[in-house]
């Protein structure tokens, strides 16, 4: 690892002299320690040096290079290993000049548990070896549809183990022919296991095997004169035939296929992933990568810039001498690099390596006229930004996850090592098809169309949200140079007759709700049902520490500026948003309530020294109907009523309703948990583990209360004496 210090002026010559001629990963950092870019190299010295060679750099790349203050490298044993490390670092560090997809770990699966009578269930989360998992599926709908099909054909159970263990008679699903009721021994273990095996084969796309086995089983029952069993198998075959006939999209084979289509439009890019499992099209999902605007040229929809000015920046800053200084005007131009095209013009590795790469072919198999995907030499050969995005998606989506045998792509992946790593990881051949034929071509066309529709819908929604944000600032008389940085926080209080009081805080910025920044606050120490006290508590807890930290930060910055000013009187302070330990102070604070709640908020903000002008109350209209709300201001301005057609009010109502939804769901969960476990928590001699075992065994508080002493004593960790004590306390 090479890790030069950034305390002195950055001198590329010293750093480059230390780099080895080995494969590895390099990382560029700016003066604040933020990661600018992560890349891999077959030869670190040649690759990194190419960024500091004037003759090869475009003005856009030079813009990024001007920001480099530190370089770190990690040597790996091979380029394939470097690819894996690069992918992990991009996900972990989210560099501003790398194309980044959200790391979606929440793909849904269909799970068959390792129970004696396996349960079929919808599942999200990490997989293990105790159970069987089928998927991932592109959507929850696809999983639930598959469960419904399996219920119709194989009648596997879907109930929780706690319910299964305590059934005394079949449930409604058995009565309507959706479950064989193993809970009451209506089917033996051997027959149920056969149904589970057939369901597994069906999910793996081996429907032909299932039909053949069922047919043999039906004839065997008939030859043994077991006509009822034969009729049951016949009905199962009929259900399966109906399901197979109803599949709207068929492939004619049992292979698994993923279809990847990329479309760029209006400065944004969409990747549409469609999944086919066992010949069944399970639907698709659209992905929108972050930081892609830094990889778009003006022709592709990126922001345009003054190339002459950028060229001057490049010439001023691209010297290997470490003592070059950029003037204020040039530095200001450098700030526009956020919107510049970087990724497509990153310098390639040395010409010799590039020529060697051009001689290689991506591992693809031809099928009836299909053309193999070729590696690129330069961006033009790959279809522009789409190929760059597709390569990033394949790396971030499939490395570490299941890879199907066939990938149908709209643009050729550029990196042979990427495909080789996928093959090694999957343990089977991975075929990449650029120009498929037949049904696969129809799937690709459909995926491309869905990508265009999703992208058009996103751009339309973004335009609408931006218009609403602008309308709100105009309505409130606010001046905001960058609407994307307008930060709105909204608070709501929720409880049931004073029980389980919770406050919610939702956050809106960059023209959309930011669910990762939502927070819930449990309200304690107040009179039940006192909304005013609850509002005071949540606002104080939310902003008190932020204000203290902001003040401390301001004091530190002032002291540092004073010290710098003594050394250089020409320095002036830079305007910045007040950042605190808990985040950035909002521009607008919405209070879901009328004059009383707004007055409480005004008092809290006055005590904390915050501007009351940012406080806006949203008084509900009749029945919470949009268009009847009144905006109430804490700084004394007259209340404002906006018509239901107002774009500003649409945004306020959207944020207010989201705060209400978030508060209600949290309150209900808290209330349900309290009601379910409160009596068990009061039992003497029953701790968390025993309480959990009781709930798992009896399915809830009602089941524990109904259990006999003998039933209680049968639970692991509960003796006969403790069972009698629990029984007495509950009765």
From Swiss-Prot:
Which InterPro entries does the entry mention? GIY-YIG_endonuc, GIY-YIG_endonuc_sf, GIY-YIG_UvrC_Cho, Hlx-hairpin-Hlx_DNA-bd_motif, RuvA_2-like, UVR_dom, UVR_dom_sf, UvrABC_protein_C
- Record's superkingdom? Bacteria
Q: Where is the GIY-YIG domain?
A: 21-99
For this protein, the record's SUPFAM superfamilies field holds: C-terminal UvrC-binding domain of UvrB, GIY-YIG endonuclease, RuvA domain 2-like
Please name one Pfam family that this protein belongs to: UvrC_RNaseH_dom
Complex and partners: Interacts with UvrB in an incision complex.
Q: Which function does this protein serve?
A: The UvrABC repair system catalyzes the recognition and processing of DNA lesions. UvrC both incises the 5' and 3' sides of the lesion. The N-terminal half is responsible for the 3' incision and the C-terminal half is responsible for the 5' incision.
Which protein family is named in the record?
Belongs to the UvrC family.
Q: What is this protein called?
A: UvrABC system protein C
- Source organism of this protein record: Paraburkholderia phytofirmans (strain DSM 17436 / LMG 22146 / PsJN)
What gene is it encoded by? Answer: uvrC
């Amino acid at each position: 690892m090479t890790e030069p210090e950034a305390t002195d002026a950055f001198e590329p010559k010293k750093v480059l002299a230390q780099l080895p001629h080995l494969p590895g990963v390099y990382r560029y950092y700016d003066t604040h320690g933020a990661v600018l870019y992560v890349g891999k190299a077959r030869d670190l010295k040649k690759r990194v040096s190419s960024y500091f060679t004037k003759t090869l750099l475009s003005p856009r790349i030079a813009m990024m290079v001007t920001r480099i203050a530190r370089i770190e490298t990690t040597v790996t044993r091979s380029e394939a290993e470097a690819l894996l490390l690069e992918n992990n670092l991009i996900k972990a560090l989210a560099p501003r000049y790398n194309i980044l997809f959200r790391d979606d770990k929440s793909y849904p699966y269909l799970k068959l548990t390792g129970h004696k009578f396996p349960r079929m269930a919808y599942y999200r989360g990490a997989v293990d070896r105790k159970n069987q998992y089928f998927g991932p599926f592109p959507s929850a709908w696809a999983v639930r549809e598959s469960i419904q099909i399996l219920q119709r054909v194989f009648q596997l159970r879907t109930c929780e183990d706690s319910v299964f263990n305590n059934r005394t008679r079949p449930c409604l699903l058995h009565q309507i022919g959706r479950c064989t009721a193993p809970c009451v021994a209506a089917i033996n273990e051997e027959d149920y296991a056969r149904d589970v095996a057939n369901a597994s084969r069906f999910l793996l796309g081996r429907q032909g095997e299932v039909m053949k086995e069922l047919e043999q089983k039906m004839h065997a029952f008939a030859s043994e004169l077991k006509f009822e069993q034969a009729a049951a198998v016949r009905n199962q075959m009929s259900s399966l035939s109906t399901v197979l006939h109803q599949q709207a999209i068929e492939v004619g084979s049992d292979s698994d296929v993923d279809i990847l289509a990329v479309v760029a439009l209006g400065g944004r890019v969409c990747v549409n992933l469609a999944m086919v499992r066992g010949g069944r099209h399970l639907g698709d999902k659209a992905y929108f990568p972050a930081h892609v605007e830094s990889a778009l040229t003006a022709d592709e929809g990126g922001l345009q810039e003054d190339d002459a000015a950028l060229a001057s920046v490049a010439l001023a800053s691209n010297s290997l001498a470490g003592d070059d200084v950029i003037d204020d005007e040039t530095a200001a131009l450098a700030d526009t690099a956020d919107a510049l095209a970087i990724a497509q013009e990153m310098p390639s590795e040395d010409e010799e390596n590039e020529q060697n790469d051009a001689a290689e072919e991506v591992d693809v198999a031809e099928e009836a006229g299909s053309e193999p995907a070729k590696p690129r030499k330069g961006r033009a050969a790959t279809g522009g930004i789409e190929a760059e995005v597709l390569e990033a998606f394949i790396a971030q989506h499939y490395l570490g996850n299941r890879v199907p045998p066939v990938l149908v792509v709209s643009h050729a992946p550029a990196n042979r090592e990427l495909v080789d790593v996928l093959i090694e990881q999957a343990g089977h051949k991975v075929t990449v098809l650029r120009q498929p034929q037949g049904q696969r071509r129809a799937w690709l066309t459909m995926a491309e169309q869905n990508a265009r529709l999703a992208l058009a819908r996103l751009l339309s929604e973004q335009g609408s949200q931006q218009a609403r944000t602008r309308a709100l600032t105009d309505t409130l008389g606010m001046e905001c140079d960058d609407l994307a940085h307008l930060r709105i926080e909204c608070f709501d209080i929720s409880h049931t007759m004073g029980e389980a009081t919770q406050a919610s805080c939702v956050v809106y910025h960059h023209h959309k709700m930011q669910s990762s920044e939502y927070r819930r606050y449990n309200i304690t120490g107040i009179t039940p049902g006192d909304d005013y006290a609850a509002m005071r508590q949540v606002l104080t807890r939310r902003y008190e520490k932020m204000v203290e930290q902001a003040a401390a930060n301001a004091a530190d910055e002032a002291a540092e500026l004073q010290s710098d000013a003594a050394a250089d009187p020409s320095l002036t302070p830079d305007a910045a948003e007040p950042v605190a330990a808990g985040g950035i102070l909002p521009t607008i604070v919405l209070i879901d309530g009328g004059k009383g709640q707004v007055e409480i908020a005004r008092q809290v903000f006055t005590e904390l020294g915050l501007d009351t002008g940012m406080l806006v109350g949203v008084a509900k209209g009749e029945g919470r109907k949009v268009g009847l709300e009144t905006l109430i201001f804490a700084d004394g301005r007259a209340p404002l009523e906006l018509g239901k057609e107002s774009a500003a009010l649409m945004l306020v109502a959207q944020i207010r309703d989201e705060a209400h939804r978030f508060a209600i769901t949290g309150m209900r969960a808290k209330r349900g948990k309290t009601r379910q476990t409160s009596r068990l928590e009061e039992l003497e001699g029953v701790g968390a583990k025993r309480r959990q075992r009781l709930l798992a065994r009896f399915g809830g508080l009602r089941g524990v209360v109904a259990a006999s002493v003998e039933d209680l004593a049968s639970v692991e960790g509960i003796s006969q004496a403790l069972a009698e004590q629990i029984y007495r306390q509950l009765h």
